[in-house]
Every structure is written in structure tokens, then in C-alpha cells.
Swiss-Prot record:
It is an enzyme of class 2 (transferase). UDP-alpha-D-glucose binds at L10, Y16, R95, K104, D120, A121, D122, N158, T159, D185, D188, Q189, G252, K255. Mn(2+) binds at D120, D122, H249. The record marks K104 as: Important for catalytic activity. This is Glycogenin-2. Residues 341-351 have a biased composition (Basic and acidic residues). Its main location: cytoplasm. Its EC number is 2.4.1.186. It is found in: Cytoplasm; Vacuole. One of its GO terms (molecular function) is glycosyltransferase activity. The gene is GLG2.
Amino acid sequence: MAKKVAICTLLYSRDYLPGALTLAYQLQKLLKHAVVEDEITLCLLIEKKLFGDEFKPQEIALIRSLFKEIIIIEPLKDQEKSIEKNKANLELLKRPELSHTLLKARLWELVQFDQVLFLDADTLPLNKEFFEILRLYPEQTRFQIAAVPDIGWPDMFNTGVLLLIPDLDMATSLQDFLIKTVSIDGADQGIFNQFFNPICNYSKEVLHKVSPLMEWIRLPFTYNVTMPNYGYQSSPAMNFFQQHIRLIHFIGTFKPWSRNTTDYDDHYYQLWRSTQRELYSECHLSNYFTHLQLGNIETETNFYHEPPCLQDLLNHGKRENQKHVDLDITSVDRNASQKSTAEKHDIEKPTSKPQSAFKFDWESTDYLDRVQRAFPKPDT
């Protein structure tokens, strides 16, 4: 019997928008050629404030075209207190933005689905065989979480790829546990291991809070190959298993869409960028997205490519006959009062103005029409 399966990612910061869009595009491509018996729904989980306040209508249109369902989520109960409590451990990672990954605890609330496959926005499935993951454990229970061992500490699992059974009681138990417990790493990976992974339950105080039925099912590493691995990676193993790798996970501060990633310019980073270029070219988004100001995560990272030469962009705009672009960049009217497409979706109009050197016609339907033609809404 076919299951209802959600393949989800979480967007907790606009810095990860390039990753989420590229991931959804790649999943759509692979699903067209995969033999999948289940009913698949691509879902984006996103905080209400982030979706309503920080995304422009063009971005919302593209998100809606790539994901069948956009699930607006509220902050967790006492989320700010939990973040503050976990601050010290999170500082050891030097990744303050990961505090919001605790929102993954909302995944167990998706009870409209029989199973949830969660993928971090900085992952890239490589082939249609990736979807075999859905057939590995047909008898999985709500007490079990399937994940790949973390390369930094293999007795713990990495939360970049998770297979789980939604359940409201489990969601409540996990979120209560999250409030009362300090995470090993200050983020989702630590707390999920403390909840599901018996190896992490050394403390009697922790043991009485979780069920003895909790279990971590170990997935093959090929379903979540992390990189860069800073000396941990086995080159012979990579060579031997290369044809069987199902998904690459770009961990750490620098992402394939980061400005300065020349040190990691290997095959898989190039593959991610090639997929991104394919996505943007299909609906002529180069002019817009190369000028997106995504802001910085609270590190030294700038999370987007250097914009191409302005003249190249102007020439490209002329070739594509993009009527929504105002080439007179010296006279951009930032105070133009124009109707936001977001109003059609009951989303509050963004207060920030586009930072691009180009001015977009917010009333024009040409942009939205091209997006819809390039990415028709998925049927499954």
C-alpha cells in the first residue's frame, strides 16, 4: 500500500534560500525518473515571520512553484529560553545560526503524512537511487529515527538526513524534552541524539525523561556523505563507494553558494553550482538572484556569489528581453507604491526594498508567468 510521504526541508534563515531552492529543483528532476510507489509531497517548513517579512514576491512565487506545500511554523514553546540555555555549547561550534535548527522538532507534527524524509537545505541528492531510502525500513515505528552516523563522532547521528514517523504524542514529548534539557551541541543534532539515541543517555536524569523504546536506525553513510571532512575522510573509501553515493551534505560554515569557496572547488561543489545555474536559467532569474543580498550569518561568511559584471547582466537582460528590468539604474525609485503579489497569499508585504541594481515591476505578471511555465506546480 502506498504511503503518503513528505520530503521536507527547513528554512530558518534567508541565508539558506539558495540551498532550499536548488534542493527542491534537484528533487523534482530526480523524481521524474525514479520508480517511487509512495505519494510524495515536497514541503518547505518556514517560520511565519521569516516568510512574511523577509521574502519578496518574486521569491515567494519561485518557492511556491518548487514546493507543493509551504508549511508555516510558529516558534517552539519557550524557544528563546532554550536558545539562551544552549548558548554555551553552541559557541563551541562557532555556529550561532544553528540555534534555530531546534525547529526541526516540528517535523513530528506532520501527521497528515505517514512518513517524513527530512533533508537539510545544504544537501544535494545525486541520483534517482536516493529514493530507495524510503523502502529500507518499511516497519519503522514512531519510536525510531533513521539517520547516518556523524563523521565527527560516529556514536551519534547526523541530523542532515532524517527518516521519521510523525506522531503528535512524540512531538509533545520531544518538545518538552527540548525545553528541559541542554543539548550536547546546543542545536538539534545534540538534542535529537539525547532523545532517540541510547548511547547518549548516560545520565539517569535523562533516562527517566525518554522511553526505553527509543531507537536510532543506522542508515548507510552513502545517504549522507558530509564534506569537507578535514582529514576524517577516507580517500580509498570515497573512491570505492563513489558510484553508490546517494546524497552529498555540505557541512560547515562555507556552502557552495558562499562567496569564497575556492578551497572547496571539487566535483561536488561544482555539481551543486551547475544545478543552481540550471535552475536559474530555466526561468531567466540570473539578473535577479545574482544581486540578491542574502546578508551574512553571524560569521565571516558572505553567503552569495560575487555578482557578475554589470555590463554582462545588462546584455543578458537585453537578450532575454526582460521587460520587468529598468535598465536606467541611476533612477531607481525605491519609494514606488506598488501592489505586492504577496497580498494574494495573505502574506504581509515586505517592508524592505530590493537591494538589486535593477528595478523590478512589482505589478507585472510577466515574471510570475515565466516562473509558473518553468516550474509547473507538482502533481504529487
